């Protein structure tokens, strides 16, 4: 497996030159464009990694699957999906278009920024600090890493420059789609996106989902089976933003990307995969990371379709 991982990294390193690091969050623009790593965890609890698999980076939009799991556990799926849809979108992850066009003004799915902001508002807690504390502890639990923490520099950078997210949130507040104190909800959202992880952490989250919510290391149930099923399904349809259809055709496994360059993926009942490739394509997905997953999926016949 390690030889295969080394091969897929080297075969796809060339794609880095065609991407660029996220620039709209100043702190992310400082990232090394050439970082590339992968980690794989099997259902038997074996771990393999190559490249920059132990380099820390911020979770960004991958946190959306974390808060979605927590919100469903806290509120039940019927309530959560009465506030946010579950349909794919052809518009960008930070677009306001669908919020204006839809009669209900409900965000179209939980993987776009507007939807994730609504989901963050549904995480239980008396204030933003308690909500985020629960999100951080849950991230540590599902990854099996109690050392995971927030990158305060990225959090500050996001909070100071998150004007589009503020616009989305205040628009939803004006239509009644978002309940609660907007700045408190945004604070939770900016913090959750600034959690720092590695490829290894992502692979462990992926293998928990691949194992229907059960840790292959301890045998303990981490999340209810139905929650894991919902999240994996939404990862397939919406997890790679408006490139989700293309990803499903060419790679064919549940995955979620973030503009920090990470991708978490899972091959149900086989393995979890974490990838880091900081150079992004025009959709906001890791360009080399996506190509690595495509080659790995073909080599190991991972597609669920």
Swiss-Prot record:
Record's keyword annotation contains Heme: no
UniProt GO molecular function: glutaminase activity
Domain of life, source organism: Bacteria
InterPro entries: Beta-lactam/transpept-like, Glutaminase
Catalysed transformations (reactions): L-glutamine + H2O = L-glutamate + NH4(+)
SUPFAM superfamilies reported for this sequence: beta-lactamase/transpeptidase-like
Listed EC numbers: 3.5.1.2
Keywords noted in UniProt: Hydrolase
Residues the record lists as binding substrate: 61, 113, 158, 165, 189, 241, 259
Keyword Phosphoprotein attached: no
Database matches in Pfam families: Glutaminase
Oligomer and partners: Homotetramer.
Sequence similarity: Belongs to the glutaminase family.
Name the record gives this protein: Glutaminase
Source organism phylogeny: Bacteria, Bacillati, Bacillota, Clostridia, Eubacteriales
């Amino acid at each position: 497996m390690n030889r295969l991982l080394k091969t897929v990294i080297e075969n796809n390193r060339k794609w880095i030159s065609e991407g660029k690091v996220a620039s709209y969050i100043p702190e992310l623009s400082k990232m090394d464009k050439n970082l590339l790593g992968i980690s794989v965890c099997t259902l038997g609890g074996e771990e393999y990694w190559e490249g920059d698999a132990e380099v820390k980076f911020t979770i960004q939009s991958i946190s959306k699957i974390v808060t979605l799991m927590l919100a469903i556990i806290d509120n039940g799926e019927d309530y959560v999906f009465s506030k946010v849809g579950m349909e794919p979108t052809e518009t960008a992850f930070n677009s306001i278009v669908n919020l204006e066009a839809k009669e209900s003004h409900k965000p179209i799915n939980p993987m776009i920024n507007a939807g994730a902001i609504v989901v963050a508002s549904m995480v239980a807690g008396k204030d933003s600090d308690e909500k985020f504390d629960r999100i951080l502890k849950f991230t540590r639990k599902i990854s099996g890493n109690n050392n995971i923490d927030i990158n305060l520099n990225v959090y500050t950078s996001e909070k100071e420059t998150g004007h589009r997210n503020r616009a989305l949130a205040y628009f939803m507040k004006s239509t009644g789609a978002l309940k609660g104190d907007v700045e408190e909800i945004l604070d939770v959202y900016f913090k959750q996106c600034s959690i720092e992880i590695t490829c290894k952490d992502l692979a462990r989250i992926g293998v928990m989902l691949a194992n229907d919510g059960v840790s292959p290391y301890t045998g303990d149930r981490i999340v209810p089976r139905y929650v894991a099923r919902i999240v994996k399904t939404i990862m397939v349809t919406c997890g790679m933003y408006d490139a989700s259809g293309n990803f499903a055709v060419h790679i064919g496994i549940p995955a979620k990307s973030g503009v920090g360059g990470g991708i978490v993926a899972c091959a149900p009942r086989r393995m979890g995969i974490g990838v880091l490739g900081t150079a992004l394509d025009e959709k906001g997905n890791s360009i080399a990371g996506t190509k690595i997953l495509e080659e790995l999926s073909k080599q190991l016949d991972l597609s669920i379709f």
